[in-house]
Each structure stands twice: as C-alpha cells, then as structure tokens.
C-alpha cells in the first residue's frame, strides 16, 4: 500500500510541467533557449547560479547585458530567446516567507516553471513535499511548514 502511494506521488510530481515542456519542445522554442543557456551561460558558471535568482524579464535582460559586457558570447538576435527561456524556467516567484527555501532547496532538482505550474491543494502540497523528502530533498523539519505554507498560499488550486 505504501509503495503504491509513493509511486503515485512520484508520478504526480514527475508529471508537473510535462505537457507544456513537450509542446514547447515540438515547436523548438524551449530547446533553443536551453541550448543558448548551456552554451552562453554555463561556459563561465554552473546552472546553480541561475536557478536561485528568480528574475523577471527586465532583470534577466540586464543580467545578460552585464554578462555580455564581461565577455559572454550571445548574439543580439538570441537575447530575447534566452530571456524568454530564463523567465519561463527560472522566472520570478512571489515574495514571502518560504521563497528563499524554495529557491535554495526545490531548485536543486526542479526549475521554477515546474513549481509555478504545480497548482495543488494544501493536502496535495503536503503529499508532494513528503514524496520529495522520501526522494532525499534536504528540507529540514523546521523548514517543512514554512515551505508548505508558501506553496499552498502562492500555488494553490485556482
């Protein structure tokens, strides 16, 4: 029984964001943005630096301009594609208690689009967080209720 529940929880979490990503991949949009990020950004630093910033389009544009000034190789016509990709996958999250934990813990395995699209009831967020703990997420006992409240408040069922 526990094995079936765990398998279900893992399947639910794995399905978060699968359909939109597949649709983008068919259109080739997400692929190009990801390729640009891998080639242009990760040549100097790892993806972790990107994952914890949660910037909007204007902020990502400024960051890219600053990185180009430091020597990053991004063609002018590729900047909007890269910005769109970063906003979609590493874009802004609502402010509030728990945001920093989500950025530092959840993004170790998930991009922010997956978190933003994961509309769930408080009970479903609790199940999801417990499933992630079972998978090895480094979420402390004191952090669990904070993250649970943040996700339930900001990414609840609409």
Describe the residue ranges of each PLM region.
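Short, amphipathic C-terminal "tail helix"
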Residues: 147-156
């Amino acid at each position: 029984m526990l094995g079936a529940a765990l398998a279900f929880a893992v399947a639910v979490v794995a399905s978060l964001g699968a359909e939109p990503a597949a649709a983008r991949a068919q259109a080739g949009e997400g692929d190009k943005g990801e390729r640009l990020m891998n080639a242009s950004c990760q040549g100097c630093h790892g993806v972790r630096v990107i994952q914890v910033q949660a910037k909007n389009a204007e902020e990502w544009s400024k960051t890219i301009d600053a990185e180009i000034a430091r020597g990053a190789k991004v063609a002018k016509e590729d900047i909007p594609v890269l910005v769109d990709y970063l906003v979609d996958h590493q874009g802004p999250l609502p402010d509030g208690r728990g945001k920093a934990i989500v950025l530092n813990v959840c993004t170790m395995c998930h991009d922010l689009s997956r978190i933003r699209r994961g509309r769930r009831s408080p009970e479903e967020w609790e199940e999801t967080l417990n499933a992630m703990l079972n998978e090895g997420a480094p979420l402390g006992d004191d952090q669990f209720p904070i993250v649970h409240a943040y996700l339930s408040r900001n990414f609840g069922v609409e």
